[in-house]
Amino acid sequence: MSSQLTVIIAGIVLVVAIVVALVIMRRGDSRFTYDTQHGTTPRATEGEGNTAVTAFKGRFSILTTGVGAMFAALAVKLWGMQMVSSDYYEKQANSNQTRTVTTSAVRGRILDRNGVALVQNRPSLAVVAYRDLAEDEVLVRHLANVLGMPYVAVLRNIQDNTEGAQSLHTIATDVRRSTVAYIQEHAGEFPGVKIAERTERQYPYGETACHILGYTGTITSEQLEAQNKKTSGDDDASAGKITYQSGDIVGQAGVESYYENLLQGIRGEQTVKVDASGNVTGQAGAVPAKAGSDIKLTLDLKIQQACETALASAIELAKTTGYSNAGNGAVVCLDPNNGEILGMASQPKFDPSVFIGGVSNDVWTELNDDKGSHPLLNRAISGQYMSASTIKPLSALAGLEFGTYTSTQTTNCTGYWTGLGKAWGKRCWLTSGHGTMTLQSGIANSCDPVFYDMGKAFFYDEQHSEGLQEVFRRWGLGKTCGIDLPSEGAGRIPDAEWKESYFTDASAEDRKWNAGDMTNIAIGQGDILVTPLQMACAYMGLANGGKQYVPHVFLSAVSRDGDGDAYKYNGKGKKKRLEAKINSDSDLALVRNGMHDVIYTASTSLAAHFGTLTPQVYGKSGTGEKSGEDEYAWFCAYAPADDPKYVIATVLEQGGGGSDTAMHVVRDVLGVIYDEPDTSSASGDSSVR
């Protein structure tokens, strides 16, 4: 063994040194002269001859004793190495002949609620090498040319210190088979370079559900530091946990990012025997990697595809009916009984496969162009818009609760409202006027003056001057819904405090909250902002009597090494987010009746389209106005009215009137769910906004 040999050599060197020292000392103590006057007997040069001999013998005895002690210690050490610590030194010797490398784990799949794979894995090849390859600049440059990568990038990957000096460092992933073949055929040109089998993400349905699923990419230095802090430790506390290395593939958006801790597997280890040149000569042991868990989502692929198809069709309809700027939009379909997201689409979409192996600069720039449509933005949860008239059912509940508009109160709509004085008059969307309107008919016909009267009453009610905002917030507006996806928007419910702090460049007078501000938010205009998901959650409450469950896309996680569900959403499948206070059953009934009339009474077009569906649908249209842009089309609804199972909320940016274009999204999705396609050819009559 090398350690024993070292000790023996050291002992021999020590003995030789001592012998040399003795010879020198012997020579020094035996220097004699001849006395010519008294014969030829030699005499010591210093002192008497007996004294010199005695001194020499004393020093020799001391050295002999020292040498004996050293040999005794050496013998004890050799005995200990051979008999007591032989296992330790054997392991040390073996470690110099082996290398331990980490092995990657397969990432978990993402499935729909019925087990259909939305994201799966495919085999791929990676180029790997040991760190000492970095010392050969010519080889590194040659490898960079073959891989089509910058020299500095290849060198950086080889020198990376997060994978350990003896680990194989990932240089390139998802390498073309032609490139791999070249490296293998010219192995002599690439000593120390290996080909490793890996897996890459595969999307069987292309762009479907791209905003929910998200995408993966190489871990960034910031992510690497943050992730490994979670599993760092000085003992075995982190054993069996996920650890990350430079070059690892992690979730960067959507479910891939939010549930990274479930999808990511636990890497394994493989110990290989190597020769003096570092070439692998055999296997010495392995700890297998543990695959990540499969995640089952609440999505129903059939409904998801229906949402995407319906949204794209409605946008095309808007373009062909005078709204050429249409192109973006979103739709959410959820279960009002538990908050499960059944379908969610955002337009435009993107192809998540472009991120495999690293996205090019040109593609990344296109996806993030400030002047473009931002395909990576999930408008269903991050897009923030004026709610338009879809908020009027909530305004009605607020008016009924605080008495600012009663069930028997009426408003005479002439098409122009002057409740705040002629100088601050406001138009109704129907400039010819609706005539006498009650609160229920005001909802059905989306009559603006009814809600102007309500907003004015709130403003001048000293006790409940912000009662309208209170109700909006109670129904979940102005704050995130808590969905398990990144980057959810909170929206905005404006009030006096917000206006004072927001318009800092305006005069003190202009920063004051006024009656006009209140009348604006009563009809969903002005500075109010909501997301499609927030409106879907609000209509969830309208459908089930005020209860709102946390919207979520996660259903369960299934360990691929186990035999069942590893984790289910909240244990029982639903978690209440809030329960909006409803003043009375009669108030809710009035609002629901108004939503019924929106579809079946006030609009002949809506009645024609929805009348061919077996279940009754209650809903509300909306048409948002934004300066310098075309109108934004909204439609929110739930069905069946007597036993709600589906809530759908949709918005089309610059897509026209809600009852003209957006309503088709809701109708088409329900048509797929109930297998009752829309057979009506009736065009929008714009009788409801």
Task: Locate the predicted segments by residue.
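Periplasmic/cell-envelope proteins involved in peptidoglycan metabolism and beta-lactam response
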Residues: M1-V359, G467-R474, G656-R689
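Beta-lactam-recognizing serine transpeptidase/beta-lactamase-like catalytic domain environment
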Residues: K273-A286, L299, G329, P336-T390, ...
